[in-house]
Amino acid sequence: MTQDTKTDFQKPSDNDLRERLTPIQYQVTQHEGTERAFTGEYWDHDEDGIYVDVVSGEPLFSSLDKYDAGCGWPSFTQPIPDVALTENTDYKIGYARTEVRSASADSHLGHVFPDGPRDRGGLRYCINSAALRFVPLSELDAQGYGQYRALFEGRQG
């Protein structure tokens, strides 16, 4: 995926999304659903690479910023630099939370909370695995995400 491809993204029709996504992916990304804690594919995933929006493929988070928050969902301290996420105030459970959505596809991703590691900015992006697709470091170039290899340069792996 190139930057041009990302900016030219046109969201598929609802019928196309229903066909392409699993039921939980559709529920989470299109209807602000939440997968059950400790059930998603990536909550304890530990491989180097990036996480992209399951709908659009737009890059969202790096494994370098992923940490175990003990909450049962993938947690990150920040998005990939220069990635645009949309934030909205969500009152669905009776109090204000900050919802996080992808910019191009407007996919519901999860929420951001101010209880992350202080030494890494203090934020916890609590993201549903169902909203993500993982691209391993070894496949970044082949899948069109080669520009993100630089995030990992100089890292002993």
Curated annotation (Swiss-Prot):
Keywords: Oxidoreductase. Its EC number is 1.8.4.12. Pfam families: SelR (PF01641). One of its GO terms (molecular function) is peptide-methionine (R)-S-oxide reductase activity. GO terms for biological process: protein repair; response to oxidative stress. It catalyses: L-methionyl-[protein] + [thioredoxin]-disulfide + H2O = L-methionyl-(R)-S-oxide-[protein] + [thioredoxin]-dithiol. The keyword Oxidoreductase applies. InterPro entries: Met_Sox_Rdtase_MsrB (IPR028427), Met_Sox_Rdtase_MsrB_dom (IPR002579), Mss4-like_sf (IPR011057). GO terms for cellular component: cytoplasm. Residues 14-137 form the MsrB domain. Disulfide bonds: none annotated. The active site is at C126 (nucleophile). Belongs to the MsrB Met sulfoxide reductase family. This is Peptide methionine sulfoxide reductase MsrB. It comes from Deinococcus radiodurans (strain ATCC 13939 / DSM 20539 / JCM 16871 / CCUG 27074 / LMG 4051 / NBRC 15346 / NCIMB 9279 / VKM B-1422 / R1).
